[in-house]
Structure formats: C-alpha cells, structure tokens
Curated annotation (Swiss-Prot):
Protein location: Cell inner membrane
Family: Belongs to the YccS/YhfK family.
A single GO cellular-component term on record: plasma membrane
Topological region Periplasmic: 1-10, 54-66, 110-112, 164-398, 463-465, 511-512
Keywords: Cell inner membrane, Cell membrane, Membrane, Transmembrane, Transmembrane helix
Protein name: Inner membrane protein YccS
NCBIfam families recorded: YCCS, YCCS_YHFK
Organism: Escherichia coli (strain K12)
Membrane topology note: Multi-pass membrane protein
Length: 717
C-alpha cells in the first residue's frame, strides 16, 4: 500500500506529465551525445517540442489515428519547406496556401486545429535549420523522429494510466463547481452594495470557465464511450459527469432578486446561513475533486444535516415573527434546491446511483465530431467566407507570415525566421488575446536573453549545457499554460542552448530580441488593421445566439412540465447550449474591456446586458431544476403563453413594440388572477415566470442600443 503522501504524488497528473517531458528531453539530448553528433539534438528536440504541443487526449485507437495524421501533416509541412526553400516566390506562395489551409482545418474541431498549429510550428522549425543538413529529407526525418519518440512515451503512459486524463477533467469540473458555488454564496452577503454588479459579473465569468471544463470532459468521455459503455469505470465517470451537470443547473438557479432578500433580511441570520451552506457545498465539491484525483471514495460531511436543521429553525422563527409569506415561500424553494444538491453529493458513490438508466437516451452524449466526407466538407465550406472569424484569422496569419518572410528576404537576416515563430505564437484571433501575449512574449524574451548570456559564459561544458537544455525544456512546459512570460523565458533559454551547440549561442542573442520585437509588431498590426476582429462588433451576434439558446432551453423545460421529468439528450443539449452561449457572451464582454474605439456607454451597456442575460438564464435554470409534470391546465396554459411571449419579446421588430407591451400587461394580469396549489410546484412556476418577464423590457432596450454599434463605430484602430 502506498502512503497518502506518496500516493498523492504518484497519481498527480502534472508530475506524470513533467516526468514524460523530462524523459523525452533526456532522450533527444543523450542519444546525439552518445553518437557524438550534438547537432542532431536540435531537430530531435524541436520535433519533440512540436509533438508535445499537439498532444491530444483519446483512447488508444484514437491516439494511434491522431499520431498518423500528425506525422503526415508534419512531414508534408517540413518537406515542403525544404523543397521550396531555394525558390523564394514559390516558397511564399506555398507558405500562404499552407497557412490558410492548416488554419481552416480547425473548422473541423479543436483536435484538427491543434494538429494544424503543430504543422505550422514544425514548418517554421524547419526554416530555422535549413542550413544544418545537405539533403532535403534529413531534417524532416529527424524532426519526425523527435515527434515519434515523444508519442511513444505518450502511448506508454496511456497504457499505464488509460483513464487518467478523463479523471483529471472530471476533477477539474468539480473544482470549478466549487469555485462557482463559492462565488454564488457571496450573492447572499447582506453587506453587498445594492447597485453593485461586480459579484454577478464574476459569477458569469466563472460560469464560462466551468462550461469550458464541462465541454472538455464531455469530449474525453465521448472518446472512451465507444464500445466501452458496459464497463464499471465508464459507468462511474459518466455518472459523475451527469451529477456535475445537474449540480451546475441547480447552483446556477436563481429564485429571487438578491437585492430584495437583502432589503428584507439584512439584519437576520438567515442570509448568512444560506451563504454558509452554499460555501460548504463548494467545499464538498472541492473534496470530491481531490477524491477523484486520488481514486478514493468520497465521504459526505455529516455536518450538512445540522446546517439544514438550523436553516429550517431560522425560517420557522421568521414565520412566527411575521415575515412576508411570499419571501418565505421563495426561501423554501431555494432550500429545497440546496437539499437536492446535497442529495446528489451524498449518494454519488452509491452503486444504485451509478447504474445507468435503462432508457438509453438518458445516458447518451451528443457527438459533435464530423461524420463522413459530406459532413467534413459542409463544416469546412461554412468558413469559406469573410463572415467567418476562422477565415479572417487564416487570411490574417497568411499575410503575417508572408510579410515576415518578405522582411527576411529583403534584409537578408540570418536568423530571421524567429520573426515568423514569434508571430505564430503571438497572433491570436482577437485583439485582446494578442495584446496580452505580445507583452508577455517581449518580457519573457528579454529576461531569457539577460539570463541566458551569463549562463552560456559560466557553463561552457557540453554536458552542462545539455543538462540545462533538459531543465529549461521541462520548465517551459510546466509554465506554458499558467505563466506565459515565464514559459517564453525558458523556451528562449532552450533556443540559446540549442544554437550554442553549433557555437552560435552568443551570436543569436541580439537577433532573437530584434526578431521578437519585429514579430510582435507585425502581429499587433495584423489584429489591428487586417479584418480586425473587434469583440464589440460581435456583441449583437453573440447576444442573438444567447437569446435563441435561452428560448430553446425554455421550450425543453416546458415540454417536461407537460410530459414529466427526465434527462433525455435533447433536454441536456438545450441546457448546455444556453449556458455555453452565456459563457460566450461573458468572454466577448470581458475582451471588450481593453479594445480601442469602445465608448464608455457601450461598455457599460454590454456589462449590464451580460449581467441581465446571466440572471435570465439562472431564472430559467430554476424552472429546469424543479421541473416535474403539472396537471393544472390553467397553469400549463399560462406557462405556454409565457414561453411564447418571451420568444416574441426577445425577437420582435421595433414596429411591434406596442403589441409586445400589451401582451406583457395581459400576462401580468393573468398571473395575478392565478391560484396555484401551495402543495405543488405551481407557485414556483408562476414566480419564475414573473421574474423572467420583469427583465424583458430592460433587455429589449439594451438590445436595441447594442444593435446600433457596428454601424456607428469605425472598423479599424
């Protein structure tokens, strides 16, 4: 048996990943040293780095397929560079076409986008070493050898730990759920300023991170479910994923305007108790995340029962003291929702809960991957238009790399291909991401050069520099996704050490700085002037997608209030789409903050609209969390009309404003005349409809304000 500390490190995926990188780099440095051909270290190491940057999670058969596709793309990219390099005009044409083609390949999904990036990277790595070997095929074969070496280690790791990446994704899901619940608990803080929207904005951004993690987990599950559904481990992970989705729906639910709660119960302990309970549930999700990583059974905290008992007692005291009955009923709905989350966590390890439902539709996952040649062509052809952000980015990157190549040809820079390498890493689809990377890239390069020159001076031995090369390579991958400036510093050190093997370490230091500055300048100019993808111009389209997804989510919930509760695939797709669109809107609004030409009025309107949309989705989520079959025809008819009205109010033309207002007044009048049964979910349905329609006038006003933005704002910076 492993000790708890040893088990923690044995099952720590980050350490396992770093160990794989370490072994791979040891191989690419030790083998050439053993052969006495240290020059071979450069293509082997660069090929290994490119392979590691394009590593994709999949089952064994999928990994082998990815490896074949990756090696094919790598060879085509590298061999094309070698063959066309002597003819600049042909090379420029090939660079343009291949860059556009590889980037458009990303239209098939993230898997192909990652492979395409690796192919472009291996092409530029080939440009850096065209003078190393006499024959055109030598460097491509060595680069591929480095890539194969890394993938062999990856396959061995997969055979030893086949479901580890899936467990990591599941653990991250519950970690993000914990953060979301903690932020949601702050909405019950009675001391928050009434007009402050910052907590809701933070909650919307956290929802975006959570949805990205859930989507990644779904992809990991899909790759393993094919032909593997009956295994106990698969049932367990699928069950954990469905529980995470259900908890997210309940956690994102809102049953009342929080400002109303603070106004009435600011001096009561009930808000603190709800806040503490949600915080405890966040801690439980965090504990569950750790249990998944360590492969330990989760033990539910027995203190939850006492917390629920105390909240029940607090609500009873408030009832005795004459608190408003409607608010107490709302708090009762909220408490029932939290009890359902508690029940999910308490029973997550039970064998009965992990048994897949007999209805196959309830344990299916939506497969968004391309199927067949016709589907592949359809997905690609959608991006053959300037309306596609991917098409614009493909054209932009083609021009960026060609312009960098032209500078090299005109100036005769010996190491100028680092300009292309910098532009490839820095130039992102939108201005905000590019500006952020640009600054970090420059800082990392300058610090790397400042550290690297003394290192080359004080460590002149070949063996010492090979050891440092391995260390800097491992540190690059360790910081790649958390500290981009640190990662750039370490990759700069790695490059200096590689070229010092040829005796050019000091010679390439200054060109590396100059090329980085030129590459960053080209990338900045490209995202600012070549079809600039300003996020504020995407706001009307993102808002439309969010409102349409919310309407589909409402329709799916309405169907279940008529037919009864289940977790069929269509319902889960509608729910996921609504939260995904909300996350996209949050990303757009966040990226707008640093863009030029966005007026304070538009920025404020977008911020308010994001908060309203997230609140709107949370009101719908409450309807979904409590969904069950209703039998009262009057309530069902009211719900039908309310859902139709919401769709109409979100999509009507300005000329129909008067008709929409009349429909709203009629709906409010009907709502006041309803008599829902207190012992059913009917009061909650009426309450949530009231909350939804109360938001619609302000959402409509901001929609009209935002829709006018593209016509009033200049295109370029």
């Amino acid at each position: 048996m492993l000790s708890p500390l040893l088990k923690r490190y044995t099952w720590n995926s980050a350490w396992l990943y770093y160990a794989r990188i370490f072994i791979a780099l040891c191989g690419t440095t030790a083998f050439p040293w053993w052969l006495g051909d240290v020059k071979l270290t450069i293509p082997l190491t660069l090929g290994m780095v490119a392979a590691a940057l394009t590593d994709l999670d999949d089952r064994l058969a999928g990994r082998l397929r990815n490896l074949i596709i990756t090696l094919f793309c790598f060879f085509i990219a590298s061999a094309s560079v070698e063959l066309l390099f002597p003819w600049p005009w042909l090379f420029a044409i090939g660079l343009t076409l291949s860059t556009s083609g590889f980037i458009l390949l990303g239209g098939l999904g993230q898997r192909y986008a990652t492979i395409a990036f690796g192919a472009l990277l291996i092409a530029i790595y080939t440009m850096l070493g065209t003078s190393l070997y006499e024959h055109w095929y030598q460097q491509p074969m060595y680069l591929l050898a480095g890539a194969v070496w890394y993938n062999v280690l990856t396959l061995i790791g997969h055979l030893l730990f086949p479901v580890r990446p899936l467990q990591d994704n599941l653990a991250r899901c519950y970690e993000q759920l914990a953060r979301y619940l903690e932020l949601k608990s702050r909405m019950f803080d009675p001391d928050i300023e009434d007009q402050s929207q910052a907590p809701l904005y933070d909650l919307a951004l956290a929802n975006g991170l959570l949805m990205a993690t859930l989507n990644q987990t779904k992809l990991s599950l899909l790759t393993r479910l094919r032909g593997d559904r009956g295994q106990r481990g698969t049932r367990r992970t699928l069950h954990y994923y469905f529980v995470a989705q259900d908890i997210h729906e309940r956690a994102s639910s809102s049953h009342i305007q929080y400002q109303t709660l603070r106004e009435h119960f600011r001096h009561s302990d009930v808000l603190f108790r709800f806040q503490r309970l949600m915080s405890m549930q966040g801690q439980a999700c965090q504990q569950l995340s750790r249990c998944i990583l360590l492969r330990q059974p989760y033990q539910h905290d027995p203190h939850f029962e006492r917390a629920f008992t105390h909240i029940d007692a607090a609500l009873e005291r408030m009832r005795d003291n004459g608190a408003p009955a409607d608010l107490l009923k709302t708090l009762g709905f909220l408490l029932n929702n939290l009890r359902a989350i508690d029940a999910q966590l308490a029973t997550i390890e039970s064998e009965q809960a992990q048994a897949l439902p007999h209805n196959n539709d309830e344990n299916e996952l939506a497969d968004d991957s391309p199927h067949g040649l016709s589907d592949i062509w359809l997905r690609l052809s959608r991006h053959f238009t300037p309306e596609s952000a991917l098409f614009r980015h493909a054209v932009r990157m083609s021009l960026v790399l060609c312009f960098g190549y032209a500078i090299i040809q005109i100036t005769g820079m010996h190491h100028g291909y680092w300009i292309l390498l910098t532009s490839l890493f820095v130039c992102q689809p939108n201005y905000n991401a590019t500006r952020h990377r640009l600054k970090l890239r420059i800082i990392g390069t300058l610090v790397g050069i400042a550290i690297g020159i003394p290192v080359l001076w004080f460590v002149p031995s070949l063996e010492g520099q090979l050891v440092l090369l391995v260390i800097t390579g491992v540190l690059f991958f360790a910081f790649r996704n958390v500290q981009y400036a640190h990662a750039t510093m370490f990759i700069t050190l790695l490059v200096l050490l590689c070229f010092n093997l040829l005796g050019e370490g000091f010679e390439v230091a200054l060109p590396r700085v100059i090329d980085t500055l030129i590459g960053c300048a080209i990338a900045w100019a490209a995202v600012s002037y070549i079809w600039p993808d300003w996020q504020f111009r995407n706001l009307p389209r993102m808002l439309e997608r969010a409102t349409e997804a919310n309407c589909r989510y409402l329709d799916a919930i309405l169907e279940q209030y008529h037919q009864g509760r289940d977790n069929r695939l269509a319902y889960r797709i509608a729910r996921r789409d609504a939260h995904n669109r909300d996350a996209e809107l949050a990303s757009v609004v966040s990226n707008m903050s640093s863009e030029p030409n966005v007026t304070p009025q538009i920025r404020e309107a977008a911020f308010r609209l994001l908060c309203l949309n997230h609140t709107f989705t949370s009101y719908i989520s409450a309807l979904g969390a409590h969904r069950e079959q209703l039998t009262n025809p009057e309530i069902l008819a009211f719900l039908d009309d309310a859902v139709c009205y919401v769709d109409d109010a979100l999509h009507h033309q300005p000329a129909d404003e008067e008709r929409v207002n009349e429909a709203l007044a009629s709906l409010k009048q009907r709502m006041q005349q309803l008599e829902p049964r207190a012992d059913s979910k009917e009061p909650l349905v009426v309450q949530q409809v009231g909350l939804l329609i109360a938001l619609l006038p302000e959402i409509g006003r901001l929609q009209r304000q935002i829709t006018q933005v593209p016509q009033e704002t200049p295109v370029s910076a």
